[in-house]
Amino acid sequence: MMSQRYFKLLVVFLGLFAMIASIAEGKGRHKNGGGSRKKTNTVNNGGNNGGKPKVPMCGTTAATCSKGSPSCKGGKPTCGSKGAFNACGGNVKVTC
C-alpha cells in the first residue's frame, strides 16, 4: 500500500517535470510548437528557413566570390563588392 502511494507521487512528479521541460524548450502543449513567436520571413532568405539567408550553390557546395560575399537577390546569385563568382568546375552553374 505504501509503495503504491510513492509510485503515484513519482508519476505526478515525472509528469510535472516533463511539462516544465517542454515549456522551457518553448514547445508548450500547443500543436504549433507553443512558442509565442511565429517564425517570419526575413529579407533574402528564400523562404522560412529560420532567418538564414539563402546562399548560392555550386552543385552541392556553397559558391564563393573573388570579392565580397555571395547572396541570392531576387532568385539570382550575386557577389557583393563588385566581385565575381569563382569557377565551380566542370559544367556546373551557380544556382540559388
Curated annotation (Swiss-Prot):
Main location: secreted
Signal sequence residues: 1-26
Key word Secreted present: yes
Expression induction: Expressed during host infection.
This protein's record includes keyword rRNA-binding: no
Bias type Basic residues, positions: 28-40
Swiss-Prot/TrEMBL keywords: Host nucleus, Secreted, Signal, Virulence
Annotated stretches, region: Disordered: 27-51
Compartment annotation: Secreted; Host nucleus; Host nucleus, Host nucleolus
Domain of life: Eukaryota
Region described as Nucleolar localization signal: spans on this chain: 29-36
GO CC terms in record: extracellular region; host cell nucleolus
Compositional bias per record (Low complexity), positions renumbered to this chain: 41-51
Function: Rust effector delivered into infected tissues to modulate host functions and contribute to pathogen virulence. Binds the TGA1a-binding DNA sequence to repress the expression of genes involved in immune responses such as the defense-related transcription factors WRKY18, WRKY27, WRKY33, MYB51, the defense-related proteins NHL3, RPP8, YLS9, AZI1, CRK11 and the jasmonate pathway and regulation genes JAZ1, ASA1, ASB1.
Comment text on domains: The nucleolar localization signal (residues 29 to 38) is required for host nucleolar accumulation but not for the nuclear localization, nor for the augmented plant susceptibility to pathogens.
Protein name: Candidate secreted effector protein MPL124478
Organism per entry: Melampsora larici-populina (strain 98AG31 / pathotype 3-4-7)
